[in-house]
Amino acid sequence: RGLGDVYKRQEYYEMGQDKVVALLKQEVENAIAHVETLMRSKFGDIDNPLLVSVRSGARASMPGMMDTILNLGLNDEVVEGLIRKTGNARFAWDSYRRFVQMYGDVVLGMKPVNKEDVDPFEAIIEDVKHAKGVKLDNELEVEDLKELVKRFKAAVKEQTGKDFPTCAYEQLWGAICAVFNSWMNERAILYRKMEGIPDEWGTAVSVQAMVFGNMGDTSATGVCFSRDAATGEDLFNGEYLINAQGEDVVAGIRTPQQITIIGSKRWAELAGVSEEERAAKYPSMEEAMPEIYKELDALQTKLENHYRDMQDMEFTVQEGKLWFLQTRNGKRTGAAMVKIATDLLHQGMID
């Protein structure tokens, strides 16, 4: 539910944005209208807003190489509508500040090229956290998040010479073209050379209705694997974060928690964390969200049985409801490849 299957042809990355819009305008608008009907909300509406994510869908899996934008469709008026719709001001402003930062990085080209360069958005976040006397992003309050949005937009104006776009469709077209263009970013080109993936294959762009892992303590986001990618062991595993969005899991801002009790206890032992501290501060999803865990475990089994291979999956929990974002055949070590293939053969899943 809520998926927009929209954009097909990679040669668009060679065109200017105006040509891409002209070619795809009707297709995109029809697909957005379909998603609006499914989600019973409206893109760009200030009373019942639909927010979307824009992500790549390359023919061959390229984990972490392509760009993604979340929470697209927000502006100063829509954020107030989101607050009225959800009754959750912190969530709405948190989503807004994340969107401005991602859009600035991916679409407006503000992400530093070199690690030594100052990231304007991260510098602002650290400044606000320091002034507030907190260490973690999720300790910031509504007024702090409003301040981040204000200062982020000022940074956009200063660096690009233009105001941050407020029109939902202007935001969407910028994101679509940026994701097409990310096929030719330096890390994606290098990855394709290493993996033997032809440049001509290109990528699709997928637009999905947003679900939110940052709506409070009954929401979460995570990644999981149907088998151990390092050893090939037939062991469901993964990581999740409560009250977070997908980028947080890999960004290292907070310590992710393990999906399973077994994985959580293994992690605690390696990290030198006592069982008492683990259970109190870093419980597994199996312990903290047992019903969601059961559903997740059942679905990962179903997906592996369907694709007949180890799966690498992304999911979000929004206020106690599980949503799957994507699945793909997982990358694995050479040793794991042999172990998984042997086990799948013995389990009758492959010939």
Where are these regions (language model features)?
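Nucleotide/phosphate-binding sheet-loop regions of phosphoryl- and nucleotidyl-transfer enzymes
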Residues: 1, 5-351
